[in-house]
Amino acid sequence: MGVTKKPDLNDPVLRAKLAKGMGHNYYGEPAWPNDLLYIFPVVILGTIACNVGLAVLEPSMIGEPADPFATPLEILPEWYFFPVFQILRTVPNKLLGVFLMVSVPAGLLTVPFLENVNKFQNPFRRPVATTVFLIGTAVALWLGIGATLPIDKSLTLGLF
């Protein structure tokens, strides 16, 4: 690798070029109109064309047709609602279950105020936020896995 020579800012030729705008931000091409008028619409229309083309060439059904007269024994929500479903399923009082669901985001909103003194971004130097994250992740996984099991094994996951 060669040694680069630093520019001499006292050089009158360089100063004249910099005054005309021929300095470090002169090279390249401008975003307007090249990118915004020509490249972005091509990418967006190309993406739409690919989606429409795949939908026309391979029209696949989403799931099986619904039969309103044959319902399953237990209806499960989508996977991302499993922890919430498990809370509502295991708590006997439904109002308490709704209160527990509302308390989760409310508790998460208090974490920045608990650690507002700590200015570090490293999670190992923010023990409260790291502990809340790890415990919350473990509880969410526990509740999510338990929601797929029968109600008698849901809290213990069939382990105990």
From Swiss-Prot:
Q: What is its main location?
A: plastid
Q: What's one GO MF term for it?
A: electron transporter, transferring electrons within cytochrome b6/f complex of photosystem II activity
- Say yes or no: keyword Nuclease present: no
A single GO BP term for this record reads: photosynthetic electron transport chain
**Subcellular location as annotated:** Plastid, Chloroplast thylakoid membrane
Q: Where are the transmembrane segments?
A: 36-56, 95-115, 131-151
- UniProt entry keywords in alphabetical sequence: Chloroplast, Electron transport, Membrane, Photosynthesis, Plastid, Thylakoid, Transmembrane, Transmembrane helix, Transport
Q: Which domain of life is it from?
A: Eukaryota
- HAMAP family (UniProt xref): Cytb6_f_subIV
Subunit? The 4 large subunits of the cytochrome b6-f complex are cytochrome b6, subunit IV (17 kDa polypeptide, petD), cytochrome f and the Rieske protein, while the 4 small subunits are petG, petL, petM and petN. The complex functions as a dimer.
- Functional summary from the UniProt entry: Component of the cytochrome b6-f complex, which mediates electron transfer between photosystem II (PSII) and photosystem I (PSI), cyclic electron flow around PSI, and state transitions.
Stated name of the protein:
Cytochrome b6-f complex subunit 4
